[in-house]
Amino acid sequence: MAAEGDSPARPRVYFDISIGGKSVGRITMELYADLVPKTADNFRSLCTGEKGIGKSGKPLHYKGSVFHRVIKQFMIQGGDFTAGDGTGGESIYGNKFDDEAFPIKHEKPFLLSMANAGPNTNGSQFFITTVPTPHLDGKHVVFGEVLNGKSVVRQIENLTTQSGDRPAKEALIVDCGELTGDAALAADVKQPDALGDPYEDFPEDCTDTLDAVAVLKIAKASKDYGNTAFKSGNYSLGLDKYQKGLRYINEEPELEDQPQSIKDELEALRFSLNNNSALLNIKLEAWDDAARSASAALEVGGVKDADRAKAFYRRGLANIHLKDEEAAVRDLTEANKLAPNDSAITRELNGVKTKAAARAAKEKAAYKKFFT
């Protein structure tokens, strides 16, 4: 064991990441400086920014650059700090440098590998694998791996993308650098989050067997952690926990040999996690997401009328803010049928009906004026 203050044999570096302007955590990485020293030092130096200004006139530094290309079940790509779109970048050795060696195969997720435009065209762009990618062996130089922050990588991987596989929300390297001393030694130790949640955020990264009982346990814990965050006023964290629970349930564990009670609990959790997500999306004014979450809740069968009323009500609220009065009236009418004594539902239903009637009258008057 290394003495206090020592550093690991291999360099360890970090990225602090934000998505859509919201801090989502840190990715810590270890570099294979013993196997591909030139490639590893290029990445390390670009993390620290120690080489100053490059030939492009831009700092040789990943800080402030983005992950510009994301392909689910493949990889996330970044490192273009000059153009930001995959057409730029620059190594510390000049524009490009040769492939150093291929000692490591792309045989697991969370490997760091150099992006290129063909043989011997390495610059600053890199990618992090999210699955094994053996078809890249011998073509791209693997030079490190992710130690911690795998959930951050998964969050980037799961972003909605637009043209050119670019994330719709900006995935930004807010800060980066090299870890030394105790910080480097602790870089591979998974730390429970602020709520004490010990489980991986994404089921594909869980090393334990995910049978129905395990999925139920983690999903229930995720709901509890979400409720704790909600009660403390941390709506974003609460939503993250509810969505985490759903990711585990959506693994669809084998249920054939399980008692009916397990199946019923999983379905009840599927409803409550979606319905709670709808509520927190409303708190966060994420109206599209609120409507989607409420719709997912309403797809679950065997739910009590009072709970279905909440889901219809929440989708109705979302539709009001999405300016879809017709859909809002439908949802709130259904909610009112299921919970006729709920004053909040009645109030919102009457309000949206009044708005719809006023708008219709205004349009009718405008048409009448147009044709007279």
Curated annotation (Swiss-Prot):
One GO term describing the cellular component: cytoplasm
Catalytic activity from the UniProt record: [protein]-peptidylproline (omega=180) = [protein]-peptidylproline (omega=0)
Record domain PPIase cyclophilin-type: where: 14-178
Pfam families xrefs: Pro_isomerase
Subcellular location: Cytoplasm
InterPro entries: Cyclophilin-like_dom_sf, Cyclophilin-type_PPIase_CS, Cyclophilin-type_PPIase_dom, TPR-like_helical_dom_sf, TPR_rpt
Keywords recorded for this protein, A-Z: Cytoplasm, Isomerase, Repeat, Rotamase, TPR repeat
Record carries keyword Isomerase: yes
Top-level lineage group: Eukaryota
E.C. designation(s): 5.2.1.8
GO biological process, one term: protein folding
Positions annotated as TPR repeat: 219-252, 271-304, 309-342
Annotated GO MF terms: cyclosporin A binding; peptidyl-prolyl cis-trans isomerase activity
Top enzyme class: isomerase
The family this protein is said to belong to: Belongs to the cyclophilin-type PPIase family. PPIase D subfamily.
Role of this protein: PPIases accelerate the folding of proteins. It catalyzes the cis-trans isomerization of proline imidic peptide bonds in oligopeptides.
Protein name per its UniProtKB record: Peptidyl-prolyl cis-trans isomerase D
Organism: Gibberella zeae (strain ATCC MYA-4620 / CBS 123657 / FGSC 9075 / NRRL 31084 / PH-1) (Wheat head blight fungus)
